[in-house]
A protein has these predicted regions:
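Copper-binding active sites and cupredoxin-like electron-transfer domains
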Residues: 2-355
């Protein structure tokens, strides 16, 4: 009886092994469908071919968003200006939050951005010290949002505990102080998610006596976690990776350049800014009229701001970028094209030759 049971078990195991072996030899004969390359026309007119999945913004239940980094870096929103009876300058701004928009951040790569006034970053708000700032905020998003400004203001204007629900409105009011380069962003939890998706912008407070003449630019340093794994896939100055590498920023030699640099990078503890071919005076947060140093390299933590002032002695193409190699190779690399005059320069080195 025992031997019979053992024999039956051995026969069962033998059949199972043979069956598995048979399956093993059958599997290779199965034809696996190959991925079919797709041709895709981006909104910029570039045609790409890919075997991966392409998210078509037209078919996505959201609003496609175009963003121009060249325009953004030179745009300052001074608000609607009026004068109160006591002589105070009132600046009124209208900011709308949305969270259903799609931006093509790289050819064929689309990202669900959350925006202030249909832009990432949001508008650069600018005022003079002592001005009364009044911001009419509307939330047209599907999630609660708010506005939190760095600077000096009353607790009820801090935008932390009073989140604004869908369809809600709130008016923020405070005086522009102190002088410097500040930051504003959504402060609804999880704050990391709201900032990473794009709800932030720069806020500049000028001194009453004004600033020296300069060619001014705004650079908001950010990243994009396009696969939502808590790590950035792209890095940039003003959202679009490699933009200013392919579209050099034209400046004049011996002209003072003033760069307002704001770091809003999430998921990475620090970011940095390295300038080629010259050095800059830097003013942390721009709150002091005396520069804290003269360098070609800055390291910034999350939320840090710096005002940089510099000029180029010699004409040519100069790079500025993150000295963290990973960041620069994933998009945070840009260029200045210094010309002898703003209108006419016989460039000895063609940009296309360098690429």
């Amino acid at each position: 009886m025992g031997r019979s049971i053992q024999s039956s078990k051995m026969l069962y195991i033998l059949i199972l092994i043979v069956g598995v072996s048979t399956l093993y030899f059958v599997i290779p004969s199965v034809t696996i469908a190959e991925e079919t390359p797709q041709t895709f026309l981006t909104h910029t007119g570039l045609v790409i071919t890919t075997t991966g999945d392409v998210i078509d913004p037209i078919g996505y239940d959201g609003k496609a968003l175009d963003f121009d980094p060249a325009k953004f870096m030179k745009s300052f929103d001074y608000g609607q200006v009026s004068v109160l009876e006591d002589g105070t300058i009132l600046r009124e701004f209208y900011i709308t939050a949305r969270d259903d928009q799609i931006m093509e951040v790289s050819p064929g790569v689309f990202y669900n951005v959350w925006t202030f006034n249909d832009s990432v970053p949001g508008p650069t708000i600018r005022a003079t010290e002592g001005d009364l700032i009044r911001i009419h905020f509307t939330n047209e998003g599907s999630k609660p949002h708010s506005l939190h400004f760095h600077g000096i203001h009353k607790a009820e204007m801090d935008g932390v505990f009073e989140s604004i629900g869908t369809g809600g409105k709130f008016t923020y009011e405070f005086y522009a102080e102190p002088v410097g380069l500040h930051l504003y962003h959504c402060h609804v939890h999880p704050v990391e998610e709201h900032i990473a998706h794009g709800l932030y912008g720069a806020y500049i407070v000028d001194p009453k006596e004004g600033r020296d003449s300069a060619d001014e630019f705004v650079f908001v340093l950010n990243g994009l976690d396009t696969d939502f794994d808590g790590e950035n896939n792209f890095y940039a100055a003003n959202t679009i990776p490699f933009y200013y590498q392919h579209h050099p920023i034209e400046i004049s030699t011996n002209q003072k350049i003033r760069a307002y640099v704001v770091n809003v990078l999430e998921f990475d503890a620090v970011n940095n800014f390295h300038l080629h071919g010259t050095l800059f005076h830097h003013y942390p947060a721009g709150t002091d009229s005396v520069p804290s140093g003269y360098n070609d390299m800055l390291t910034m933590s999350q939320g840090d701001r710096q005002i940089l002032e510099f000029s180029y002695k010699y004409p040519g193409l100069y790079m500025f970028h993150a000295h963290n190699t990973e960041f620069s190779e994933k998009g945070w690399v840009s260029t200045f094209l210094a010309k002898e005059t703003a209108d006419d320069f016989d460039n000895k080195v063609e940009y296309d030759d360098i690429i």
